[in-house]
Amino acid sequence: MFEHEDITMAFIKKMRKVTIAIIDSGIDNRFKNQFKCKVSGIGVTLINNEIKIVEDYFDENGHGTLTASVIINECPDIEFFIIKILDRKLEGNIECLIASLEYLLDKDVNIINMSLAVEKNGRDSRLKKICKRLNDQGKILIAAVENGSKKSIPAIYSTVIAVEGRKLKQNFDFMFSSNKRINCVIRSEPHLYYQKKDDYVMYGDCNSFAAAKLSGKLCLLYTSPSPRD
């Protein structure tokens, strides 16, 4: 339907409720009570070379919960659909990522956040194709560029918005350019974010944070009244 150079046009018809999918390490089971928001999800795992969809999407690492915390800090009026593919060591595999994106073809979500990157030997034409299919549906895909790198998968694809965090000297939160390899640069400054019960940590000096922050800002655009309303 559109690539990221047309992203502004996607928001002409705004909606009052937005659902974001987060593909990550899951989410803390107290999150929805902490922030009074709707949370649902699944786990996707590879067992004996076979993809399994499971009900467990509890976060054993904290990374996925921090991602959701950054997003809801930008846009409180939001619904989450969580897909857990990373374990307590933040390890996963490309098969689970592909299966997760395929699952989202049939889910009513507006934005897909991937604060992750695939290893350099993880190029797979199936991943590129599924990102395009989701993009053709009008779903916005956001991915963090691998820390310390200028390109990574899936951020490198033209149907995915590639995000990096930096220490910006200028007096603005982000820079966006559709015709560059890194499409969006977000101001990267650590703040306190919820990770688990009674536990807030300083988080923000990484590209995962930057991708989550952009996702939250776009969610806020979705929920804001349109000038054409």
Residue ranges and their predicted role:
Residues 10-14, 92-113, 124-137, 149-162, ...:
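Mature extracellular/periplasmic domains of secretome proteins
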Residues 81, 140-142:
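Structural detector of well-ordered beta-strand residues that form the stable sheet scaffold
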Residues 58-65, 146, 202-213:
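Gly/Ser-rich catalytic serine loop of serine hydrolases
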Residues 24, 152-220:
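Extracellular S/T/G-rich loop segment that most often corresponds to the catalytic His/Ser-adjacent loop
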Residues 53-119, 215:
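Subtilisin-like peptidase catalytic core
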Residues 222-229:
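Conserved small/polar residues in nucleotide/adenosyl-binding loops
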Residues 113-115, 142-145:
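Active-site neighborhood of phospho(di)ester-bond hydrolases with catalytic His/Asp-centered motifs
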Residues 2-74, 78, 197-198:
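Active-site core segment of subtilase-fold serine proteases
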